Amino acid sequence: SAFQPVPYITTYGATKAFVLSYSRAMNRELKPMGIRMMAMNPGWVRTEFFNHAFQTNNRVQYFNYVQEAKDVVATGLKDLYKTKKPYSVHGLPIRNQVRLVKLLPHSIVMKVWINQQKKAKNNNNLTTK
């Protein structure tokens, strides 16, 4: 959500984009003091959020490649201490998605997102892959 516009969860996506931009800028500002700041961009993580999302009529119902929190944290800590990356992305599917949305026009990215959500809604697909 931080790397692409996401219709129907607009505020969520905008907030994620802000946090990514803020973290990258703060990381640069804090560098002379030896302080690192890194944004976590894990994709979907199995948390209490899912219990609430499944109980609403929210249009966003398709949770692709849900990660376990402990795995996301392990990747984040590894990236924080062993790389100079300004952000951490857990899992190959999400890393590939981040790369792809940087190359495609936002209009196409949003169409794909909307079609994915419509497909999930039509199939009552509330499960994860």
Question: Which stretches of residues belong to each language-model region?
Answer:
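Catalytic tyrosine of NAD(P)H-dependent dehydrogenase/reductases that use a Tyr as the general acid/base
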Residues: 12, 20
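Active-site segment of SDR-like NAD(P)-dependent oxidoreductases
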Residues: 1-4
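C-terminal tail/cap regions
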Residues: 63-65, 71-129
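A short, exposed helix-loop element centered on a Lys and neighboring polar residues
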Residues: 24
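Active-site helix of classical SDR
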Residues: 15
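SDR active-site lid
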Residues: 27-92
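Active-site loop immediately N-terminal to the catalytic Tyr-X3-Lys motif
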Residues: 6-10
